[in-house]
Amino acid sequence: MMRVVFIGTGDFGVPSLEAIALDGRYTIPAVVTQADKPLGRQKEVIPSPIKRTALKHHIWVFQPENINSAGSIQQIQFLKPDLLVVCDYGQILSKAVLEIPSIGALNIHGSLLPKYRGASPIQAAIMNRDKETGVTVIWMDEGIDTGDILMSDKLLVRSTDTAETLHHRLAELGARLIIQSLEAIRAGKAPRIPQNNALASYAKKIKKEQALIDWTKDRHEIDAMIRAFNPWPVAFTTVWIGGEKKILKIFKVIISHRAKGMPGEVVRIDRHGILVAAGRSGGLLLREVQLEGRKRMHAADFARGARLAIGTVLGQKDEQ
């Protein structure tokens, strides 16, 4: 029976781990994941989604601070894996780790490589308004998402997709793809297709400050940004309320062709939400927002409670 050590941390890899664990043709001697970390305002120490999944299936969990240390390498060698399957782990694997398995190391990546190598391929696909994206399983090498392609599959990006919804669908696709990849390896029919580096692009790790909305941009571009940054870091603007500049997070909008005003100007407030003008033409109807220190709510309720006036310009440095 093929021995597969699964290496991952985030929930993108959960469906893949579940699929391998439930497939009787493979055994998982261990799951390697990042150390438990404090999360949220309460700083409660919470195990990773991969650790929780592993424990549910009674799989031994190994949580090294550094997977490339001599001790970690020795521990993984002791497991005698045929394959490493890596997904959303959070550490770069050294050549010494990649050489441990008898067959090789596979990585499940949320894009159609060589497009969007790096940390944020799902957000990049939405921000760039791509019509399709997908998942690629590669044979790992020492580069960042540069290994030979074993298998890939695509799906359509919906105009309403957020990073959360697209993440979920790609994770499910990844699970189907890793099982097909393992089957191909078992049958001795697993290809190694070199990536075309001339077509490579990179999706760097997202920083919170990137989520500040520039209202001079096109309404479609702003809409894509809002969807790409939901649920994290969440697109935001600023609004002056009672003489104070506050941060307003924006979760959901509807593209409008009828907004006329300067970029960021509130041109209409009604039960449907807050209509804000964008650059070039048209605007966005804000539907779900969250003022700093408050709960997420319908934009109409926020406008009423904050006494937001038509003509207010969002994103202004100084009060009007």
Swiss-Prot record:
Q: Which EC number(s) does the record attach to this protein?
A: 2.1.2.9
**Cellular component, GO annotation:** cytosol
Keyword list (alphabetical) reads:
Protein biosynthesis, Transferase
Q: Which reaction does it catalyse?
A: L-methionyl-tRNA(fMet) + (6R)-10-formyltetrahydrofolate = N-formyl-L-methionyl-tRNA(fMet) + (6S)-5,6,7,8-tetrahydrofolate + H(+)
Instruction: Specify which residues bind (6S)-5,6,7,8-tetrahydrofolate according to the UniProt entry for this protein.
Output: 111-114
Cystine pairings recorded for this chain: none
GO terms for MF: methionyl-tRNA formyltransferase activity
Q: Which InterPro entries match?
A: Fmt (IPR005794), Formyl_trans_C (IPR005793), Formyl_trans_C_sf (IPR037022), Formyl_transf_N (IPR002376), Formyl_transf_N_sf (IPR036477), Formyl_transferase-like_C_sf (IPR011034), GART_AS (IPR001555), Met-tRNA-FMT_C (IPR044135)
For the protein in the UniProt heading, the enzyme class is transferase
What is the residue range of the signal peptide feature?
Answer: none
Pfam families associated with the record: Formyl_trans_C, Formyl_trans_N
What role does it play? Attaches a formyl group to the free amino group of methionyl-tRNA(fMet). The formyl group appears to play a dual role in the initiator identity of N-formylmethionyl-tRNA by promoting its recognition by IF2 and preventing the misappropriation of this tRNA by the elongation apparatus.
Report the sequence similarity comment from the record. Belongs to the Fmt family.
Q: What is this protein called?
A: Methionyl-tRNA formyltransferase
Which source organism? Methylacidiphilum infernorum (isolate V4) (Methylokorus infernorum (strain V4))
